[in-house]
Amino acid sequence: MKKDFITKQEQRQPLRQLYMWLKSLQSTLVFMQTGAHPDDETSRMLARLSLGDGMHVVYVNAVRGQGGQNALGPERGDALGYLRTEELFEAMRVIRADIAWLAESSDDPISDFGFSKSGEQTFEHWGREHSLRQMVKMVRLFKPDILIPTFLDVPGQHGHHRAVTQTTIAAFDEAADAKKFDDLELAAWQVNTLYLPAWGGGGGSYDDEVPPPDATHEIRTGAYDAVLGGTYAQIGEWSRACHATQGMGRQVDEEERPVPLHQLRTASGKAVPTGLTQDVPERLAALAAHCRDEKGREAAILAQKAADDALTAFPNGEAVLSALCHLQTALLALEKSVSPRHVHRVHLKMRQAGMAACEAAALQFHFEVSPAVPVVGQPAEASLSWHVADPANAPVISATMKGPEQITCGPFAGSGRGKRRQSMTASLDIAGPPIDAMTGWHGVMVSPTSLHAEVSVKIAKTEFVVPLCPDTVFSTMPVHTGQITPNRTLLRHGQDSDIDMQLQLEATLKPDEHAHLTLPKGWTFDLVAGDSDTKLQGRVTVPSSARQGHYRIGAKVIEQEVFSTQRLAYPHIRPQTRFAMASANIALVDTAGLNGVRIGWIDGGVDEAHHWADQLGAHIIQLDNNRLISGDFEGIDVIVAGVFAGGTRPLNRSMRHIRSWIESGGHFVSQYHRPIDNWDKTQSAPLRLQPGSPSIRWRVTDAVAPVRMLQPDHPLLNSPNRITNEDFDGWVKERGLYFASEWDPAYVPLLAMSDTDEAPLEGSLLAARIGAGSHVHCALNLFYQMDHMVVGAFRLFANLMTPSGRT
């Protein structure tokens, strides 16, 4: 496999990048779309507006995507949120768009807490006022002329989507009211036009109950751009493919795929029948009407001519640079004369002209920090380097660094003058608290809040200033880092009392420092071995008086928390490091074990429930495709089909063998599946069974929704553990999803539950007797509950995994 840096260097496309920046000089409009999750954006529309029309596109996203699935690897929760943050960064880079986040940091209440069915349910987590404040902030920062949410606020749509649409519509007025959220210290901004999508949000997941509004406008995406090598719809899919953890991106042909819009509101109160805006300067020349003197009006006309000349000169770099220098000169004159309401348009064009000039001059900037993730309190260095095509006529480069208040940036000192690759370095003093990789926005219109360099590039006596961020995601490391192992442990109450545990620190402690574990009350730690400067190794003893529950063990050096680190790296995104307080989580559960049970696992790569079966004492046998297709189940007591396993494993081909094995006395457990996971209601289960669609109608999103036992005396709810309503206490995120919507009469529904004001669903847990054996289909989100140490989930899981012919 090629090394990442070689691949990136090989795939550089400076001419394409130059072309994209030159296109951005053709419009002075700002277009903002809002969405809830990374991958909600209407990519082909944004590609057309940005790369076709030259509008400055800003996509405002609410959450980081912590609640999604991961098609690439094991990362879930917060780790997945970091991956999806980077995926959206890459997706927007493809279509040359800025990104802003309502959740500006990893601890923001606007989080991907799980599925919801209404805006009200969503705001219970996010906070309605906080959400609106954040949306108003982004509107005032980026000053869009056109604003549109991604989805409609209608029943049957995801509650996160509905909440974002509500705040987007409200922000149209609120952002223009200087008295609202004046603590932001941002000038009020009136959006010119507000649109809604004129398309429905139905499909396999959602079920809009109200049809979309009539289309008043249309964005056509079928035009082919010979330089970029695709239509805007195709480029949109290149962007969507960056959301690889969500399996996004599909092949589309060169055909027209229009995007219909519905004009909802305008600043004037009058409909705008043609064009997307009214009385807004759409090009540099149009700014002439907003200048206070003739010199400014002439500058606007000259700026427009220079922007046009630069695009016409492409790909002649020398001619492009000449035109860009004329453009920058005109923009400086225009800046002094244009109305304050429109000066941001001039500033944006200056930055975009600077980015274009850097590409035309083939500077190929690199901005690196060493070490890549500096430790708080330890020295670090920043290095800025660039390529010089002609050392005898090299641009004059200078730079200043800016960043959060925790960072003190030294001045840059240059080296390598006269060489093809020149550079400058500067010192960084890093204070606490640690800086997280998640930042509030990325792009060229608004200066980053994270570490960045403001780089001055002088070409032929014309100065351009561009913002540059480090090549890799910038964050800083806490002082003390390490790992506690094992980090997740299941103990059976009354059976297990000791845990062998180790704290491994990543750096040697100072002579006056010492590390210790922080234990629940009454728990003890006996040191067995280890160098106290780097490692503690010993045995944790749980007192007999400890009650069933979830317990946490942490670590400190003196009184400073120890943090664990996780490196996140995939080829399609920039690597990054996240950190969280080091911890070991223990579930102390009053449950029977699975000692001696041989479980054949059909792993779908989504859940790790087999880990918990192993901790309960079962012997796990991972069934490969050959064993499935041949029906080689000799010596296996239970077969489990993991979450979504049918999407990647030959479940349908092997079902006749599984059915025969069940009839001979085997116990089969299937976890929840989507209809898209190659599900066939007559072939994917031993008897007819169908997961419901659209999924919003067949899930219970309220994690504390009441659960009614339809068959309280059924063996599955009584052996080996007696399941009660207490076992459904403390659940997180949701009860379950993709509940069965229809099933063979042989199946017995065991539970009923629903979200508020909805009819009870009975397809969450089904059991059937088939010959001498049995099948249980479980659409409860058990694996997620166990991963979050919910004790009742372990008790029910043990019952599901026990082969006793109880159904």
Residue ranges, per PLM feature:
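A short helix->loop->beta-strand "cap" motif at the edges of active sites that frequently abuts
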Residues: G54-M55, W189-N192, S664-H667, G773
